[in-house]
Every structure is written in structure tokens, then in C-alpha cells.
Regions:
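Short aromatic-glycine-(Arg/Gly/Cys) micro-motifs in beta-strand/loop hairpins
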Residues: 1-15, 45
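Generic structural motif
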Residues: 9-11, 24, 49
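Surface-exposed loop/edge segments in extracytoplasmic proteins
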Residues: 13-19, 59
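A short, charged, amphipathic alpha-helix used as a generic interaction element across diverse proteins
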Residues: 21-42
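Short, mixed-charge low-complexity intrinsically disordered segments
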Residues: 35-66
Length: 66
């Protein structure tokens, strides 16, 4: 079973909310909703690999390494 963690950030790069899901599609939908609410959200899998993001990535988080 896979686990996906979605974290929402404000424009200063501070993590504001985190949710964990076992379904990639649910994680994708939550990521979109969080980005609309907070400005940026990204989803990582159980191993910390990038699974998706929405919104404008804050400069404070640096460049995403894929």
C-alpha cells in the first residue's frame, strides 16, 4: 500500500496543513484544494519522492529537485 502526504504552504514557505492518503487520486484532489486555499501545495510519496504540486512554489522552499 502506498502513502501520499500533501503539505500546504503559504507564500513565505511555511507549512500550514498536512494530510496523508492511501489513494493517489484523493491526494491529487486534496493537493489542488489546498493550493487554492493556501497558495501552494505539494504531494510526496512514502519515500519522499515528488508526486505532484499545484500553485506557485514559494522561493523560500527553493527549487524542487525531481
Amino acid at each position: 500500500m502506498f502513502t501520499f502526504t500533501t503539505t500546504a504552504y503559504n507564500s513565505q514557505g511555511q507549512a500550514l496543513e498536512t494530510e496523508t492518503h492511501n489513494d493517489s487520486w484523493s491526494a491529487c484532489e486534496i493537493c489542488l484544494a489546498m493550493s487554492e486555499q493556501f497558495g501552494y501545495a505539494e504531494t510526496l510519496d512514502l519515500w519522499g519522492r515528488h508526486s505532484g504540486d499545484y500553485g506557485d512554489r514559494p522561493e523560500a522552499l527553493g527549487q524542487r529537485v525531481y
